[in-house]
């Protein structure tokens, strides 16, 4: 696990089965039930329910995206945890 530097927040994206990402990012954008939220270092603490869409984040100079359907978000001043219960495309017959 890389150390979080000033201007970064630690992002963890997890499912019940695995850790999809765990490391420092410059920012993250997460889909909630009522729209997108941007997460930056120093963000106010919150707990929210994910909506369908893409979790997007900037890590190491590259933007990464992950499609999600449902889950929860927990944010503190220096940490963001995205708990994904269903990834986009899962559950389709």
Question: What does each of the following model-derived ranges do?
Answer:
Residues 10-93:
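Compact, glycine-rich, soluble single-domain proteins
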């Amino acid at each position: 696990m890389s150390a979080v530097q000033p201007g970064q927040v630690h992002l963890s994206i997890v499912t019940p089965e695995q850790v999809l990402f765990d490391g420092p990012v410059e920012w993250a954008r997460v889909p909630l039930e009522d729209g997108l939220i941007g997460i930056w270092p120093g963000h106010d603490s919150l707990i929210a329910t994910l909506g369908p869409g893409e979790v997007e984040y900037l890590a190491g100079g590259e933007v990464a995206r992950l499609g999600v359907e449902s889950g929860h978000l927990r944010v503190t001043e220096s940490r963001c945890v995205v708990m994904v219960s269903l990834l986009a495309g899962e559950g389709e017959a």
